[in-house]
Structures are given as structure tokens and as C-alpha cells.
Amino acid sequence: MTRSVWKGPFVDGYLLKKAEKARASGRNEIIKIWSRRSTILPQFVGLTFGVYNGQKFLPVLVTENMIGHKFGEFSPTRTFYGHAADKKAKRK
């Protein structure tokens, strides 16, 4: 089920403050965030966020196509090593 329209998008309060401060300073440095649940807003376009995946901060450069999505969608938490090879097929 999606979020109700009358509630608006969810964004942690500290995230808006950090984004405003970064935009005011003009420096393009990574903003470290732990809030994977926050929605990406138009104010974040052009900024680089370090989204925590449980192990490290993955840099995410926000573009126009990302607006409305969540930060967690762009920071995978699991490592895919591939499927195990079939030993019978390998021998032939």
C-alpha cells in the first residue's frame, strides 16, 4: 500500500537541514545519511549523499529521475555472488 497523498512525502527533519547547509556552502561534499526511508525531494537534485547500507556509505548523486523514490533504493544492502555453477556441466 502506498502512502496517503494528504500526508505528503516522508523526509527526516535533519536531512532537510543538512541539504540546505550544503547548498548554501556551495561545496560538493558527500552528505552522510542513515535515513534510507526518506523520500528524495526536488531540493536534493545535484547533491551527493552517502547512504548507509549497514556496512559503509555508498555515494548517490541525486538526479531528476530519482525524485519521489526512497534513498534506500539506490544503496543495496545485500551482495550477490552469482548462482552456483552446475558441476556436471563443468566436467563436459
From Swiss-Prot:
Mind listing the UniProt keywords for this protein, alphabetically? Ribonucleoprotein, Ribosomal protein, RNA-binding, rRNA-binding
Q: Does the keyword rRNA-binding apply?
A: yes
- Classification via InterPro entries: Ribosomal_uS19, Ribosomal_uS19_bac-type, Ribosomal_uS19_CS, Ribosomal_uS19_SF
Q: Which PROSITE patterns match?
A: RIBOSOMAL_S19
The answer, when asked if Oxidoreductase is one of the entry's keywords, is no
The domain of life is: Bacteria
Q: Which GO terms describe its biological process?
A: ribosomal small subunit assembly; translation
State the Gene3D superfamilies in the record. Answer: 30s Ribosomal Protein S19, Chain A
**Recorded GO MF terms:** rRNA binding; structural constituent of ribosome
Any single Gene Ontology cellular-component annotation: cytoplasm
State the family named in the UniProt similarity comment for this chain.
Belongs to the universal ribosomal protein uS19 family.
| Protein function | Protein S19 forms a complex with S13 that binds strongly to the 16S ribosomal RNA.
What the entry lists under NCBIfam families is as follows:
rpsS_bact (TIGR01050)
Q: What protein name applies here?
A: Small ribosomal subunit protein uS19
Q: Which organism is it from?
A: Rhodospirillum centenum (strain ATCC 51521 / SW)
- Which gene holds the coding sequence for this protein? rpsS
